[in-house]
Amino acid sequence: MAKQIQAIRGMNDILPTQSPLWQKMEAVLRSSVSAYGYSEIRTPIVENTDLFKRSIGEVTDIVEKEMYTFADNNGDSLTLRPEGTASTVRAGNENGLLYNQEQRLWYMGPMFRHERPQKGRYRQFNQFGVEVYGIGTADIDAEVLMLSARLWEKLGISDHVSLELNTLGDPAERAVYRDALIAFLEQHKDALDEDSKRRMYSNPLRVLDSKDQNVQAILAGAPELMDFLGEESKTHFSQLRELLDAVGIKYTINPRLVRGLDYYNRTVFEWVTSSLGSQGTVLAGGRYDGLVAQLGGKDTPAVGFAMGLERIVLLLETLELNKDIPSEVDVYVTAMGDSCLVEAIKIAQELRSALPNLKVMSHCGGGNVKKQMKRADKSGASVALLIGEDELAEGMVTVKHLRNDIEQQRVARSALGAFLAELAIK
């Protein structure tokens, strides 16, 4: 027997038993962004490597360690996209969507990062994101947070997530703070772990995000960015908090929250959960006013967020919110003998036309009644339709209920659609 080929480590299949939960989640995401008037954008999976070096930052973990990068036949350096924001900005600049315009966009699709696979974190993962361009005021920051809160409400997990909020100020304020933070870290250099020592000069704000407990103890005495903000940044953050308070969105200010990408400024946020252990962040984002110009466009304010969908699915499963997913099949149509096969197939087609929301599966492959009933039960259908010679002769169909104790019934073929609609099969 030939050796089986396995999936690449960290790149997982979504199997038929899992896909209904994904479909339900994706439907919630689509309906929620639609309610806010956002438009979908779809970008290529492969981009020029420079796009991510210029946007994410050359000294970030993503660019240094995690990107899937290769040379094509022309010698160009290409990369499988590790996140969605940079591609959205590139598409907006290239197609004239962002020049003196407001855009509210959303996207959903696979991303790729070569990191250590673990529960809720994979090398190919699906990301959903929202991006807004052309609005620089705090009210749009509040809107994207309101939208994110709506997602949790619609998914039924509002009680299991909490919002953490911070501001990074503008680039000039952050530069002054950066110098102060480096000076502080230099005083404690010998006590820092190797990762923090490496980041201390190249990306010192990322030290604030260290998972090392000893480093966090040292950082308790570090200067706080809030003390380095100018009036404009303080006002923006104050207005955002006021709007969130007005609509009842609770939050905690986390002065250590920085985000892992270089392009953020002012507002940054994360929704976190305690239900997934160490992988607690389920959605993250913020404002990135300089990125559009950094990638060749005009100065354009921007704000957005992204969420890894595998982690949301894991949270739904952990909270056992995947139990009420409807079956992929409502009605299973059987033919009691070869002479009935043609009419059974015709009946199935008639039902699909008359009741387009009804999920109808026809039995194929022959077999006796016992085999067909076994297949019907395994399909998850609520009812099976038995079509034999007696039924055809009388213009009837036998309806067998598979999920309750109702006795089987004979229904006129002409009334079958109305009968099944009245059953309100879900």
Swiss-Prot record:
Cross-referenced Pfam families: HGTP_anticodon, tRNA-synt_His
InterPro entries in the record: aa-tRNA-synth_II, aa-tRNA-synth_II/BPL/LPL, Anticodon-bd, Anticodon-bd_dom_sf, His-tRNA-ligase, HisRS-like_core, HisRS/HisZ, HisRS_anticodon
Keyword Oxidoreductase included in the entry's annotation: no
CDD domains in alphabetical order: HisRS-like_core (cd00773), HisRS_anticodon (cd00859)
Documented EC number(s): 6.1.1.21
Top-level enzyme category: ligase
Reactions catalysed according to its record: tRNA(His) + L-histidine + ATP = L-histidyl-tRNA(His) + AMP + diphosphate + H(+)
Molecular function GO labels: ATP binding; histidine-tRNA ligase activity
GO biological process: histidyl-tRNA aminoacylation
Top-level taxon in the UniProt lineage: Bacteria
Subcellular location: Cytoplasm
HAMAP family from the UniProt entry: His_tRNA_synth (MF_00127)
SUBUNIT field: Homodimer.
UniProt family annotation: Belongs to the class-II aminoacyl-tRNA synthetase family.
Name used for this protein in its record: Histidine--tRNA ligase
Source organism: Shewanella baltica (strain OS195)
This protein's encoding gene: hisS
